[in-house]
């Protein structure tokens, strides 16, 4: 997955952006339960730091920031109150590790960022977009495949999997997303708009699964164009349902789209 480096790319500065809650979550469920002498659960902290050090060793970035979700309604909840409504609450053993990892990161002088009304994905998207525009390379570390829509030639999405305490990482530039999913990172949003997402409780269009959604988007490029040719869609049920549930498809696309122009108070120097 390493990109061939030419002279110019060697000169590009790099930032690593870590989706804090997502990686803690992955670590929590991937590392057996550990507690310290005071009875604090530490497995997520341990697993998170393992992933962090592995990434830093591989990426050697000039900048690093960890984003966190704020426990508050986001603009998506305001638009669709049922958004993420099926999520189970965070396990108490994991919840108690969140403030501790923030303290650990602070002690290590690692910048963290969170903002009410936005999800970590929006912070990742906005910061990665602005860093790429500055001519930097970006590595986003997240367990959430929604972030694949952010992949470009210079933004790499790294999805860690921890099994038996060992971490393996899947890497995606834009070309890798296309290779694995058959669509570009931007089209990935439209596939999700059609098929929905049970994890985030995004409704999508009834009766359209991943296969049909992918086929439609490969052929038509986006939901708007598919809707213009709705009578031609196969199978007939997909055609009928996209027409009938069009508003739901549009809503789903908005919910699934990461904001890359959010108002984020980010100062690159603090991430150095």
Where in the sequence are the language-model features?
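Short, Lys/Arg-enriched N-terminal segments with co-localized hydrophobic residues
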Residues: 1-10
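Short, intrinsically disordered, charge-balanced linker/junction segments flanking boundaries
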Residues: 6-7, 266-272
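Extended two-metal-dependent nuclease catalytic cores across DNA- and RNA-processing enzymes
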Residues: 13, 32-35, 85-266
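Non-catalytic, usually N-terminal nucleic-acid engagement modules in DNA/RNA processing proteins
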Residues: 11-65, 69, 75-80
């Amino acid at each position: 997955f390493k990109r061939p480096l030419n002279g110019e790319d060697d000169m590009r500065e790099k930032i690593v952006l870590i989706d804090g809650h997502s990686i803690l979550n992955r670590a929590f469920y991937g590392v057996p339960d550990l507690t310290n002498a005071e009875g604090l659960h530490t497995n997520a902290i341990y697993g998170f730091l393992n992933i962090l050090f592995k990434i830093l060793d591989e990426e050697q970035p000039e900048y690093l920031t960890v984003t966190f979700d704020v426990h508050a309604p986001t603009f998506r909840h305001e638009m669709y109150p049922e958004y993420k409504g099926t999520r189970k609450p965070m396990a108490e053993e994991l919840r108690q590790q969140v403030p501790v990892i923030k303290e650990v990161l602070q002690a290590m002088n690692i910048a963290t960022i969170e903002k009410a009304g936005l999800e970590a994905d929006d912070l990742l998207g906005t910061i990665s977009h602005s860093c790429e525009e500055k001519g930097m390379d970006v590595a986003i570390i997240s367990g959430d495949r929604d972030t694949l829509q952010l992949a470009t030639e210079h933004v790499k999405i790294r999805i860690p999997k921890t099994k038996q305490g060992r971490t393996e990482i899947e890497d995606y530039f834009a070309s890798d997303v296309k290779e694995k999913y058959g669509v570009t990172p931007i089209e990935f949003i439209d596939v999700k708009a059609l098929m929905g997402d049970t994890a985030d409780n995004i409704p999508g269009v009834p009766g359209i699964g991943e296969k049909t959604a992918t086929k439609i988007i490969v052929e038509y490029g986006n939901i708007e164009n598919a809707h213009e040719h709705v009578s031609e869609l196969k199978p007939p049920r997909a055609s009928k349902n996209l027409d009938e549930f069009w508003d739901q498809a549009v809503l789903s696309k908005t919910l699934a789209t990461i904001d890359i122009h959010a108002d984020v108070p980010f100062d690159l120097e603090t991430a150095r």
